[in-house]
Swiss-Prot record:
Transit peptide limits: 1-20
Catalyzed reactions: a ubiquinone + NADH + 5 H(+)(in) = a ubiquinol + NAD(+) + 4 H(+)(out)
Gene that this polypeptide is encoded by: NDUFV1
Keyword Transport: yes
Lineage: Eukaryota, Metazoa, Chordata, Craniata, Vertebrata
Pfam families tied to this protein: Complex1_51K, NADH_4Fe-4S, SLBB_2
Binding site for [4Fe-4S] cluster: C379, C382, C385, C425
Protein name, as recorded: NADH dehydrogenase [ubiquinone] flavoprotein 1, mitochondrial
Family: Belongs to the complex I 51 kDa subunit family.
Assigned keywords, A-Z: 4Fe-4S, Acetylation, Electron transport, Flavoprotein, FMN, Iron, Iron-sulfur, Membrane, Metal-binding, Methylation, Mitochondrion, Mitochondrion inner membrane, NAD, Oxidoreductase, Respiratory chain, Transit peptide, Translocase, Transport, Ubiquinone
Omega-N-methylarginine sites (modified residues): R257
Amino acid sequence: MLAARRLLGGSLPSRVSVRFSGDTTAPKKTSFGSLKDEDRIFTNLYGRHDWRLKGALSRGDWYKTKEILLKGPDWILGEIKTSGLRGRGGAGFPTGLKWSFMNKPSDGRPKYLVVNADEGEPGTCKDREIIRHDPHKLVEGCLVGGRAMGARAAYIYIRGEFYNEASNLQVAIREAYEAGLIGKNACGSGYDFDVFVVRGAGAYICGEETALIESIEGKQGKPRLKPPFPADVGVFGCPTTVANVETVAVSPTICRRGGTWFAGFGRERNSGTKLFNISGHVNHPCTVEEEMSVPLKELIEKHAGGVTGGWDNLLAVIPGGSSTPLIPKSVCETVLMDFDALVQAQTGLGTAAVIVMDRSTDIVKAIARLIEFYKYESCGQCTPCREGVDWMNKVMARFVRGDARPAEIDSLWEISKQIEGHTICALGDGAAWPVQGLIRHFRPELEERMQRFAQQHQARQAAS
């Protein structure tokens, strides 16, 4: 997703760091991972059980939801803040703080919650699994989140290619209406709340929150300039919060089990459990729920069956979806999978889509393919992105062939820096970072490829 990824470029401002809290009396944890089954939030992640209302009720969904609603917005926001939950769509912004922006006196305009289910980030499929196998968690999360911010309704914007998932979600919404769980007097709480599904049309840029809002309004999906921010002027000109599917879906469980319980997982400022997608050169690609701050090596070896050919065959990993810089094997040995640890490693958690590449990978060609994707998906609104990504794509194509000069490596780095931070949305950043990761860690590979091409060219000339 494209939700304000620039926060990944550095540490969070000090004014928001105090928002992360946990149980200060508990001893500080030093090891992470091996999440117990009783602590898993997504208990039907693999679709082994009934996803409809009857099955959801048997797994604890919709349990005491009325009590949660009756406790009011301040109590819900308090639990979310205590939990230390950070946005699961890529930016990692404190969820309780973000939702509290909506909790202000009404000016007569209705408030809306928009759920970003436009999951288009290459390598990412966690939200798809939630919608396909646990849709009632999302519907209940919309109700609880909507209550926290005083929203009148939720719009779930789902990727156009997710046809079956959208069908399951629509069935879950209908069941919730028929059971009186949403709609008029939701759960008997006296609170009215509606949920609507909006289908996307395949544009990656609509994963950016303001482009998504434009699309819901029936306009071309192009990001808006901010300010005004969606919390002031969002969908249909009304106060709006845009939140990721996973962020919304975990909120009822946090309220039921307590923010302190959720804060007990992971390192400080990196609380909770997290869905990880592991794909690429692993023996068993999977989506798994694990504790935040789990070591990357443990995540791959325990849940994905290890790297094909063994750990020593590992070349590099993209840890957070295609828009985060890759890290080489030497970094993968010890890095933890959380926001702060990956920022220190000059990359980011992003969507937690772990793309594993072994030594058979043509790393230059792999990154070039990602740049081609971003060139295609750029909306063209900003000159640095429109022209810069096209330029990067052409240079990377020459790097793949080796038909370039070593000085062009530095030129490409400068181009990426001119794109990063100079666009309306974060798509430009997402296109620049893979290139920066490649140059930072695999510059010798680029130079060797150019040298090899030059030698072959000289040999052909000599032969002719």
